[in-house]
């Protein structure tokens, strides 16, 4: 049996991680298994897709680190059938978030919800780093006709 050569200082499983994806069932993506993606309309942010319809989910969930000039060029999830949510996970970022005509500055623990067709825009206003969670899903009207509102 031939002995496997491993470069000194590198782990034997360099190209693997503990992430598990079972289509139409579940996904566990560990930090070392995350891939940085380019998300249209989001600038200066290292975003990772944690879940999407591509693996069977009924929603899209992103996590990312915002750079000093992070901002959106178009509102995230602004289609007529999409509702969205943003949450500032951690960091010292001051994030100006726009939902329609309303703007607020969010810090760690802050969040905003945008009803369908409105979308969420954001801009890092203090140049500090922070992490965010972005979420969007298809809007399903309430059976009694109640309308959602921005939070």
Regions found by a protein language model. Give the residues of each.
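N-terminal accessory scaffold of Fe(II)-dependent oxygenases
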Residues: 2-35, 129-133, 142-144
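A short beta-strand-loop-beta hairpin characteristic of the jelly-roll/cupin
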Residues: 71-108
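A short glycine-rich, His/Asp/Glu-containing loop-to-beta-strand
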Residues: 34-76, 82-83, 151
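Short acidic, glycine-rich loop/turn motifs
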Residues: 54, 95-99, 124
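Conserved hydrophobic/aromatic beta-strand scaffold that supports enzyme active sites
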Residues: 47-49, 61-65, 85-87, 103-105, ...
């Amino acid at each position: 049996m031939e002995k496997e050569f491993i470069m000194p200082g590198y782990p034997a499983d360099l190209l693997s991680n503990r992430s598990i994806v079972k289509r139409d069932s579940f996904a566990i993506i560990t930090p070392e298994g995350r891939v940085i993606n380019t998300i249209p309309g989001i600038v200066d942010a290292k975003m990772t897709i944690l879940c999407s319809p591509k693996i069977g989910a009924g929603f899209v969930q992103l996590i990312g680190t915002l750079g000093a000039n992070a901002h959106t060029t178009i509102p995230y999830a602004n289609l007529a059938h999409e509702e969205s949510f943003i949450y500032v996970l951690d960091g010292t970022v001051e994030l100006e978030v726009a939902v329609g005509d309303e703007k607020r500055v969010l810090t760690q623990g802050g969040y905003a919800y945008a009803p369908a067709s409105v979308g969420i825009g954001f801009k890092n206003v203090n140049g500090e780093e922070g992490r965010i969670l972005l979420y969007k899903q298809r809007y399903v009207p309430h059976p009694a006709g109640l309308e959602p509102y921005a939070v």
